Amino acid sequence: IDTTDYRSITPGWILYNYPEVEFIIKLLRHTTCKESCDYCHTQLDVLHNLKTFFGYERFRTYESEPLQERAAQAAVKGKSLLAIFPTGGGKSLTFQLPALMAGHSVHGLTVVISPLQSLMKDQVDNLADRGITDAVTINGMLDPITRSLSIQRVQDGEASLLYISPEMLRSKTIEKILMARHVVRFVIDEAHCFS
């Protein structure tokens, strides 16, 4: 594992033979210790990373409640949550920021399940417009070369966000990819796609 490259991932054979390794790495790299710790401030603080990744000084509030920040912080802490925001209310940020943070700190992969291929493409394109190239989508609309490149980016640890449709969960290719990566969370974007 190349410790100087945040995209370096634990080899699949280690994950297969020693599955507890990822848990230990997560404990070591994803547990806050004290206020003065530089690592905790730069790697685990949601406000610091909001500025680093997205250039925002603060999260949105709703009727003076920091709901967006609470949702992002809960995800960073590994809690399961249900976040309901209005259209355009910043819901995507609540899973994208923790996904990027986990990608950098524990080489984790966040799988986002979304019913619309156009929405997946928009999400990946919007992140790319911000200079964030950690997201890919794998879906039936991709030409074979683009699909192959997306798969390779996930396998090589270059992607920390993978957008797929619910149907793709049945794909043997997707299953193989996910088994070889440390999946830190699944996000259901538009919960009605599982009804």
PLM features per residue range, with description:
Residues 84-89, 94-135, 139, 157:
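Conserved SF1/SF2 helicase motif Ia
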Residues 58-62, 87-89, 137-142, 162-164:
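Short, flexible loop segments at the rims of nucleotide/cofactor-binding pockets, characterized by
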Residues 35-86:
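Conserved pre-motif I regulatory segment
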Residues 100, 125, 142-185, 193-195:
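Conserved helix/coil segment N-terminal to the catalytic DExD/H
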Residues 1-40:
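N-terminal accessory nucleic-acid engagement/regulatory domains that precede
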Residues 86-89, 190-194:
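Conserved helicase ATPase motor motifs in RecA-like P-loop NTPase domains
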Residues 76-79, 105-107, 131-132, 155-158, ...:
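Short loop/turn elements that form and flank the Walker-type P-loop nucleotide-binding site
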